[in-house]
């Protein structure tokens, strides 16, 4: 049996088996430096609990068959910033937005912001470049439904000394005011979001999914919104109960979604799984989708955006994923004016 390293960070490695199976295969063991890490059955699997800047050997075993040993070296990581040290409670009651945001803003280059076990109510968090955001197992970022407290991303802000506008918010293919997402990236690069934790929007029919066709202050947020971002990897986490689309990379490049769960009720409104819009080099691999709209919808804006920017979506690579519930597995559009 053969495999290769799909992704490696400071504390995680993701492997992909080189077999003909789709999403799942016969059970196999993963051994790291001679120690059993567990028995697994998915074609793409992430192993955590590694140390930064360290050499490792990994081998797979199935019955009497063993793979070749593959060596890898984890990325360096200068420091960990624990959000509890910045005042986050993680008790499911206090609003932990400002404490977690402070940790993100203080994070030095290539360091880790750690969210340990607990439930952390938040509105919107804004990423910065060159960082790792890790949600440990049983760590939950829990969405706060409060339109008055959630930041708005303006759709169009006119430039002072030149023609055109600065576009931050987007809704269904147009530059329109929208609420900032639980995880928002604006012009950031080199970010990893990882771990076994959960991003839970806590949307239901009493809040965000009520009156889905109405703009109330702004249009509904996504769970992860990446606007003009580059080299972003999301691996291992579960994303669920989104107010609208779950994963929305927008005019971005080199975006990876690996070994994830994306979930929402089958009757939830506009909860697309992953909608790359005017993006290049997007990889979606080992993702389990079960949502209330299209699992994956490739987009490039409505007619206005298509004519103005002429940025198509291209080089979108999708494999080893399970589309369970959803209106469509992989769709093109709507909102595909730029191709």
What are these language model-derived features?
Residues 1-339:
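Extracellular/periplasmic carbohydrate-active domains that bind, remodel
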């Amino acid at each position: 049996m053969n495999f290769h390293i799909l992704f490696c960070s400071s504390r995680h490695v993701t492997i992909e088996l080189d077999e003909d199976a789709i999403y799942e295969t016969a059970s196999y063991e993963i051994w790291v430096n001679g120690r059993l890490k567990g028995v697994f059955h998915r074609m793409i699997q992430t192993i955590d609990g590694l140390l930064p800047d360290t050499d490792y050997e990994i081998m797979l075993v199935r019955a009497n068959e063993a793979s070749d040993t593959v060596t890898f070296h984890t990325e360096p990581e200068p420091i960990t910033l624990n959000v509890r040290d910045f005042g986050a409670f993680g008790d499911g009651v206090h609003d932990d937005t400002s404490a977690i945001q402070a940790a993100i803003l203080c994070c030095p280059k290539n360091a880790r912001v750690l969210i340990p076990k607990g439930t952390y109510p938040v509105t919107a968090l804004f990423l910065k470049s060159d960082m790792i955001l890790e949600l440990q197992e049983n760590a939950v970022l829990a969405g706060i439904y409060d339109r008055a407290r959630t930041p708005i991303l303006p759709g169009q802000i006119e430039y002072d000394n030149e023609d055109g506008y600065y576009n931050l918010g987007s809704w269904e293919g147009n530059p329109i005011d929208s609420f900032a997402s639980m995880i928002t990236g604006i012009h950031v690069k080199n970010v990893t979001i990882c771990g076994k934790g959960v991003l839970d929007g806590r949307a239901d029919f009493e809040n965000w999914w009520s009156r889905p066709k109405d703009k109330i202050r702004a249009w509904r947020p996504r769970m992860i919104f990446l606007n003009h971002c580059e080299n972003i990897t999301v691996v291992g986490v579960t994303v669920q109960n989104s107010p609208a689309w779950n994963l929305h990379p927008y005019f971005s490049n080199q975006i990876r979604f690996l070994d994830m769960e994306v979930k929402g009720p089958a009757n939830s409104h506009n909860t697309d799984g992953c909608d790359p819009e005017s993006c290049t080099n997007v990889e979606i691999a080992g993702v389990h989708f079960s949502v209330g709209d299209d699992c994956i919808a490739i987009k490039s804006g409505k007619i206005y955006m298509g004519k103005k920017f002429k940025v198509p979506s291209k080089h979108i690579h999708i494999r080893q994923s399970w589309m369970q519930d959803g209106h469509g597995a992989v769709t093109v559009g709507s909102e595909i004016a730029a191709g």
